[in-house]
Regions:
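Core beta-strand-centered patch of the WYL/Sm-like small regulatory domain
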Residues: 1-80, 86-90
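Polybasic (Lys/Arg-rich)
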Residues: 71-166
């Protein structure tokens, strides 16, 4: 949307060709999980922002790829359904947040106790600014340990935010 509350379309208003597979609820919004035929990958589309839908008789693209997706596990990788490179991230977490971690990533994760105050967990996450915002929302109680490129990106993200407030 523009400041005048008018629609501004991505891709110069060109139509998307999407094979729809699932609806997911995240942060009180429904998202369509669809296979983008042009980009040859799954993407998320907020349902209330979709306009001008047309059905085709073309077969669904991405059927083999969709068979590999476990929807509950898949959705836990994304923060506010924003995409990003999916990576295995090691986090050091304050023990008080065990419930937060299991709520977010499920109970089938491996948790390693470090000491009475902290534990480590490795989770698959789509790294994005929204993920970084989630980490910072716990005021230093969650630390990204690895991979090193994600730690560096997070530090750069924090520097940009700090610079904005100088």
């Amino acid at each position: 949307y523009s400041i005048g509350n008018k629609n501004i379309f991505k891709r110069d208003g060109k139509k998307y060709i999407i094979s729809p597979y699932a609806l997911m609820l995240e942060d009180q919004n429904y998202y369509l999980l669809g296979y983008d035929t042009n980009d040859k990958k799954f993407k998320h589309y907020r349902v209330d922002k979709i306009i001008g839908i047309e059905a085709t008789t073309e077969p669904l693209d991405g059927q083999e790829e969709f068979k590999e997706i476990n929807l509950p596990k898949y959705s836990k990788k994304f923060f506010s359904m924003f995409g990003g490179n999916v990576e295995k991230i090691k986090l050091q977490v304050d023990s008080d947040l065990i419930g937060v971690i299991t709520d977010r990533f499920g109970k089938n994760i491996i948790i390693k106790k470090i000491n009475d105050n902290n534990f480590e967990v490795i989770v698959e996450i789509a790294v994005s600014p929204q993920f970084y915002g989630w980490v910072t929302s716990f005021s230093g109680k969650i630390k990204i340990i690895s991979p090193e490129n994600t730690v560096t990106d997070f530090k750069n993200h924090l520097k940009k935010v700090a610079e904005f407030y100088k």
